[in-house]
Amino acid sequence: MSQQTITAREREFLKFAIDSGVLRFGEFTLKSGRVSPYFFNAGLFNTGALLARLARFYAATLAAVEPEDFMLFGPAYKGIPLAAATAAALAERHNRHVPFAFNRKEIKDHGEGGQIVGAEIAGRVVIIDDVVTAGTAVGEAIEIIELAGAQPAALIIALDREEETSENGPSAVQDIRDRLGLTVHAIARFSKLIEYLRDTPNLSNQVSALEAYRDRYGMLGE
């Protein structure tokens, strides 16, 4: 668990996710079979206003941690709107003119053809997604980027669950770092969510359930 104090941007993002109904509390059965006391459904950032605001959080995080030139790659399908909206936010808010591209899951054999849509994949490439679980989509994105002769530089996600993928195994983020060699940035992390809830009177009653979940499945050293 991170020992750093929650930042203003993390606090603002978590409030935004909760107020938007994207981050909810209760009992949710995950694909893994675990019963989680919270659920983050980024698919509910489904209006222009919500997507634009989400993109500003991605852009602010990237502007702070990626001083060098880079381009964005959005894995199909969830990464597509994230890449486009974040590139726009980087230009509008940070004067960073970042190319973006995404892949088709089905290769097109007419028109412009091919698998890649958008800018030519070149240079340092940051992969953008909402969350990671198994890391399969990230691995496929790395293959596409390397096949184009470019450098997979980092992955950015909205929320790092900081949760082991199997008993005593690494978290999805740790696995991507160790197995795929990618730096991983996140707008917010599970440990910061607990801190945010602890400091928010009308939500502090959720803390004990999240702490119990962290104690059972969390990556305390991440």
Give the predicted meaning of each segment:
Residues M1-I128, T133-E222:
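PRPP-associated nucleotide enzymes
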